[in-house]
């Protein structure tokens, strides 16, 4: 299923059983049979999460997919999930040229 971002996890009787997602204007409720795997990328494009977990890297120009905003991490934490090794961020160091802000 493409272009269908999850918006929140579905909690039932002490466990995550699915996700609420959106495809265009349609809201979908997708129930999992055996579990939910959150494979949502990193969070280097979330200023909030970068400041929280790795303040030294928060001011570095991020590299990678601009969709890496930590949405999956935030959804899991909303239900009490713990996180590990968030200070280890894979990064390609670079810089912006003054006349070329997208460089």
Residue ranges of predicted features:
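A conserved short coil-to-beta-strand element within the FAD-binding core of flavoproteins
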Residues: 2-16
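Short low-complexity, flexible loop/linker segments enriched in glycine and/or proline
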Residues: 14-17, 98-103
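Short beta-strand segments that buttress and anchor functional surface loops
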Residues: 18-22
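Glycine-rich loop(s) and the adjacent beta-strand/alpha-helix scaffold that form part
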Residues: 23-101
């Amino acid at each position: 299923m493409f272009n269908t971002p999850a918006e929140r996890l579905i909690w039932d009787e002490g466990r995550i059983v699915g996700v609420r997602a959106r495809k265009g204007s349609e809201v979908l409720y997708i129930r999992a049979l055996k579990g939910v795997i959150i494979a949502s990328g990193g969070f280097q494009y979330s200023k909030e999460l970068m400041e929280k977990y790795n303040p030294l890297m928060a001011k570095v120009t991020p590299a990678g997919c601009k969709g890496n905003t930590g949405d999956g991490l935030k959804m899991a934490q909303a239900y009490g999930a713990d996180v590990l090794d968030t200070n280890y961020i894979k990064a390609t160091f670079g810089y912006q040229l003054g006349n070329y802000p997208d460089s």
